[in-house]
UniProtKB/Swiss-Prot annotation:
Complexes and interactors: Monomer.
Family named by the database record: Belongs to the LolA family.
Phylogenetic classification of the source organism: Bacteria, Pseudomonadati, Pseudomonadota, Betaproteobacteria, Burkholderiales
UniProt name for this protein: Outer-membrane lipoprotein carrier protein
Signal peptide: 1-27
PANTHER family, alphabetized: OUTER-MEMBRANE LIPOPROTEIN CARRIER PROTEIN
Keyword terms, alphabetized: Chaperone, Periplasm, Protein transport, Signal, Transport
Pfam family, one: LolA
GO BP, sorted A to Z: lipoprotein localization to outer membrane; lipoprotein transport
Record flagged with keyword Aminoacyl-tRNA synthetase: no
Localization: Periplasm
HAMAP family from the UniProt entry: LolA
Role description: Participates in the translocation of lipoproteins from the inner membrane to the outer membrane. Only forms a complex with a lipoprotein if the residue after the N-terminal Cys is not an aspartate (The Asp acts as a targeting signal to indicate that the lipoprotein should stay in the inner membrane).
InterPro entries assigned to the protein according to its UniProt record, in alphabetical order: LolA/LolB/LppX, OM_lipoprot_carrier_LolA-like, OM_lipoprot_carrier_LolA_Pbac
Length: 214
């Protein structure tokens, strides 16, 4: 399924308790994440998504896609793939819409059940990350400070989520699913707290599209 990474979409307040025991670099990473989830209410930017294959040193890029995103906490966002195909995941705070342009098909599902312990809960949800995740200190790689998030629920799609910051900016996420597959998301051109129009997340079903409700 092409939108597997964020579907079924489809936050780290308690992590502050780790600061005293964590190394300085990790304290900085925790501070940056805490700042992101509490102070960034809206944002827009670009992303590149890489599906990886193999393990460890043998990890190689299997496929690459890219696009744009915009969000307004909590639960309003538009995640748009533009290459190599067009696809849209959009939520208005209540309902998540997944639109496949090639199939001219829209899937609707209730947003509350779609976020949960997914990467979307970090990017687009409330700032109560400790409700859904446990936190483990990660390494600093190429100047990017990492934290590892493990979903508290055992039946989630992802078994581990890494999130990296540099200079207060969200740089990347590494997602490992229950089957051992790894996906890397890198972010660029991020604008923090832009003013967004009132109808920015209103979804209109494309003409002639089939609609499936889940």
């Amino acid at each position: 399924m092409r939108y597997r990474i964020l579907a079924p979409l489809v936050s780290l307040g308690a992590a502050l308790a780790l600061l005293a025991a964590a190394p300085v670099a990790q304290a900085a990473a925790t501070d940056q994440l805490q700042s992101f989830v509490t102070s960034v209410k809206t944002a827009r930017g670009e992303f590149t998504q890489q599906q990886m294959k193999g393990k460890g040193a043998d990890l190689k890029v299997a496929s690459t896609s890219s696009g744009t995103f915009v969000f307004s906490r909590p639960g309003k966002f538009a995640w748009r793939y533009t290459k190599p195909y067009e696809q849209l995941l959009q939520a208005d705070g209540q309902v998540l819409y997944i639109y496949d342009k090639d199939l001219n098909q829209v899937t609707e599902r209730k947003l509350d059940g779609a976020l949960g312990s997914s990467p979307a809960a970090i990017l687009f949800g409330s700032n109560d990350l400790s409700k859904n995740f446990d936190v483990k200190n990660g390494a600093t790689r190429d100047g990017v400070e990492w934290l590892e998030l493990t979903p508290k629920e055992k039946d989630t799609q992802f078994e581990r989520i890494g999130i990296g910051f540099k200079g207060g900016n969200l740089e990347a996420m590494e997602l490992r699913d229950a089957f051992g597959n790894t996906t890397i998301l890198t972010f660029s051109a991020i604008q923090k707290n832009p003013s967004l129009p009132a109808d920015a997340f209103r979804f209109t079903v494309p003409k002639g599209a089939d609609v499936m409700k889940q």
